[in-house]
């Protein structure tokens, strides 16, 4: 199955427009969103932008009902009452309400969680390590994969609100024992990168995040990954900063192993 990966949103409604174009063009069969829907630089008072972004996410969820959603640290910070950089106390009640609306728009409540698996690809915001599983429950190291994911998704907030968890881990900078890298590819966001790249079977995709002045940090691209082989295509899209007035998605495809 070809899965389009939608990286961190951070109040950028146009990312859903680009994703929709890729799906409509038949480049992918379904999508997985790595979320972090709320918060961005100096946006605490822009309540309407929060609302518009969640409404766009909800519309996308309805239009593409097979989409999977992976909570990010900025998402859970609101219902969990954990302050995060960029947290907006002014948007708090609306964000919590919109998350409930998003969850209720899904075909199944299991479509939104910390981690998901499609065949041989694992999706989470930050990535899963063997070290985290040892801390959570060492028996999980030898458990069936669906039992592992269920245990992660059912873990307490204290376990998950931790730098080593799939909400927070940064494989781009931290050296840890990755979970079954010879068996599964992982796709993550969370940490802004200049280029989409793979390291120890973890593919980093957060290229749309910005500097404090609004400039995009990374390239304008998303990936479509084959859920069985783990091979992926990088699809270039028109970034918001490149052309505010042009809603077209210009596509070029490069194949990676």
Question: Where in this protein do the model-derived segments appear?
Answer:
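Conserved beta-sheet core of the metallophosphoesterase superfamily
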Residues: 172-236
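Beta-strand-turn-beta hairpins that frame and shape the catalytic cleft
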Residues: 1-4, 116-123, 199-201
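A short C-terminal boundary segment appended to hydrolase-like catalytic domains
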Residues: 243-257
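Active-site-proximal loop/helix segment associated with metal-binding centers of metalloenzymes
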Residues: 90-101, 112-181
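Short, solvent-exposed aromatic-acidic interface loops
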Residues: 234-246
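Core catalytic region of metal-dependent phosphoesterases/phosphodiesterases
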Residues: 6, 11-102
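Active-site environment of divalent metal-dependent phosphoester hydrolases
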Residues: 10-17, 39-42, 74-81, 129-131, ...
